[in-house]
Curated annotation (Swiss-Prot):
Species for this entry: Salmonella typhimurium (strain LT2 / SGSC1412 / ATCC 700720)
Single GO MF descriptor: serine-type peptidase activity
First-level EC class: hydrolase
Function: Involved in UV protection and mutation. Essential for induced (or SOS) mutagenesis. May modify the DNA replication machinery to allow bypass synthesis across a damaged template.
Gene (name only): umuD
CDD domains: S24_LexA-like
NCBIfam families named among the record's database cross-references: PRK10276.1
Protein name: Protein UmuD
Record keywords: Autocatalytic cleavage, DNA damage, DNA repair, Hydrolase, Protease, Serine protease, SOS mutagenesis, SOS response
Keyword check for Transferase: no
Family the entry assigns: Belongs to the peptidase S24 family.
C-alpha cells in the first residue's frame, strides 16, 4: 500500500460543474450552461491536515467499487463506525476493509473469494482512517 499526503497547492483551480444530470440510459439533449465551479480539493478533502491518499492493490474490495490501482482519499480525523471502509493494520499488516463492530469485530473483504478477518481481544488492530472517496481512471 502506498501512502501519499496532499501538498499545499499554489493555486486553486475551480473546474466547471454542470448540474444537469447525465442519464446513463438513452441520450437526451444536455443543458449548455455551467451552474457553478468546484474545486476538487474542497469536494474531496474536508480536513486537509488529517487527510492522505492511499493507492489500493489487490481485488478484495471490488464489490465496494475499489479496484487495483485506485486512489483512496482517507480522513484520519473521523472516528470509524460500524460499516465504514477503513485503512487498518492488524498485527502490523496494512489493509483496506469494511469495519464490522457488531456482533463481533471483524474486517470484512468485499469480495466473496476472501474470508473475513476476525479481530480477537489478543489481536492488535489500529485504524488509520476512514475512506471517504475513491478516485479511479476509467480509460
Amino acid at each position: 500500500m502506498e501512502f501519499f499526503r496532499p501538498t499545499e497547492l499554489r493555486e486553486i483551480i475551480p473546474l466547471p460543474f454542470f448540474s444537469y444530470l447525465v442519464p446513463c440510459g438513452f441520450p437526451s439533449p444536455a443543458a449548455d450552461y455551467i451552474e457553478q465551479r468546484i474545486d476538487l480539493n474542497e469536494l474531496l478533502v474536508s480536513h486537509p491536515s488529517s487527510t492522505y491518499f492511499v493507492k489500493a492493490s489487490g481485488d478484495s474490495m471490488i464489490e465496494a467499487g475499489i479496484s487495483d490501482g485506485d486512489l483512496l482519499v482517507v480522513d484520519s480525523s473521523r472516528n470509524a463506525d460500524h460499516g465504514d471502509i477503513v485503512i487498518a493494520a492488524i498485527e502490523g499488516e496494512f489493509t483496506v476493509k469494511r469495519l464490522q463492530l457488531r456482533p463481533t469485530v471483524q474486517l470484512i473483504p468485499m469480495n466473496g473469494a476472501y474470508r473475513p478477518i476476525p479481530v480477537g481481544s489478543e489481536d492488535t488492530l489500529d485504524i488509520f482512517g476512514v475512506v471517504t472517496f475513491i478516485i479511479k481512471a476509467v480509460s
